[in-house]
UniProtKB/Swiss-Prot annotation:
Sorted UniProt keywords: 4Fe-4S, Iron, Iron-sulfur, Metal-binding, S-adenosyl-L-methionine
Cofactor remark from the record: Binds 1 [4Fe-4S] cluster. The cluster is coordinated with 3 cysteines and an exchangeable S-adenosyl-L-methionine.
Lineage start: Archaea, Methanobacteriati, Methanobacteriota, Methanomada group, Methanococci
Record GO terms (molecular function): 4 iron, 4 sulfur cluster binding; catalytic activity; metal ion binding
Domain Radical SAM core: 36-256
Protein name as catalogued: Uncharacterized protein MJ0804
Binding site for [4Fe-4S] cluster: 50, 54, 57
Cofactor: [4Fe-4S] cluster
Gene3D superfamilies hit by this protein: Aldolase class I
SUPFAM superfamilies registered for this protein in UniProt: Class II aaRS ABD-related, Radical SAM enzymes
Length: 286
């Protein structure tokens, strides 16, 4: 008899089974396998400008118009935003929150966290913001500067701690195997008493930023293994037992259906074309 399973297969299968969906993904069609062509939450795009220069970012590689993408009338949640740093247009963020709350929607804000302060966080909460996602993929000033081009690590970490006092706070981290493994483990340990959740994403490489990644010392041959992603998330969860450490829901729902042997051998396609928003566009109503 040929045995294709081993101890690591059982471990991976168990990790996928016990991982919980991040709150941002609740209500998204992407976690419903019965929907043939699922759509993610609609988004409101305010600007493509950003005060960081992240080496893995796709935002500067594609032109996206300001406006609403997707059907708000059929949605439960809207995301502000998926391109650029929305807090560069703080007044636009405030108007977007008010507009969406009038429609009875949950509002999730995605930001790099550099422009936050306690006053802004409290004001956004008072306007009805439900959830904030702050990007942080390192646990040192040096690695942060290498990834983003700026020296804002301490500011962002402090703003995460402030935000968690007022809002459901999710830290979004990019996992780069062989590059920031220990950084993420230490970050999880630090956030155990602050953030509510950490959502770990695999690094996606685009042709346009491939050289930037290589110049930073990232080995592109290490990217994409589901095995590595599940194992790092499991170790991060051990370091942060008080909070939920997980992966994006539309991937997790698929992995939960897979055998451990498949999980141990499957590779995610991390070499991609720059994403484009192929959804209905409407201008902002304000």
């Amino acid at each position: 008899m040929i045995v294709l399973r081993n101890e690591i297969c059982d471990k991976l299968e168990n990790i996928a089974k016990i991982l919980k969906f991040v709150r941002h993904c609740i209500g998204c069609e992407g976690i419903n396998l019965e929907i043939e062509n699922p759509q993610h939450h609609p988004s409101i795009e305010l600007t493509q400008k950003c005060n960081l220069n992240c080496i893995y970012c796709y935002s500067r590689l594609k032109t996206v118009k300001r406006g609403i993408y997707g059907n708000l009338e059929e949605a439960e949640t809207v995301t502000i935003s998926q391109y650029g740093e929305p807090l560069l247009d703080l007044e636009g963020v405030k108007k977007a929150i008010e507009f969406c709350k009038d429609l009875g929607l949950r509002v999730d804000l995605q930001t790099n966290g550099t422009l936050l302060n306690e006053e802004i966080i409290k004001e956004l909460k008072d306007l009805g913001l439900d959830l904030i996602m702050i990007s942080l993929s390192s646990f040192s000033r040096e690695k942060y500067k290498l990834l983003t081009g700026k020296d804002y690590f301490n500011r962002v970490l402090n703003n995460i701690k402030i935000a968690s006092k007022y809002l459901h706070t999710i830290v979004r981290s990019i996992y780069i195997p062989g590059f920031n493994d220990n950084e993420l483990l230490n970050l999880a340990k630090e956030l155990n008493n602050y953030a509510d959740e950490i959502m770990v994403h695999q690094l996606i490489s685009y042709k346009e930023n491939e050289n930037l990644l290589k110049n930073a010392g990232i080995d592109l041959n290490n990217l994409g293994r589901i095995r590595d992603l599940l194992l790092i998330v499991d170790e991060m969860q051990k370091n942060a037992p008080k909070i939920n450490v997980t992966i994006k829901g539309c991937l997790l729902v698929q992995l939960k259906e897979m055998d451990g042997f498949i999980l141990n051998n499957i590779t995610y396609d991390v070499f991609s074309e720059v994403p484009d928003i192929k959804r209905e566009h409407r201008p902002l109503p304000w």
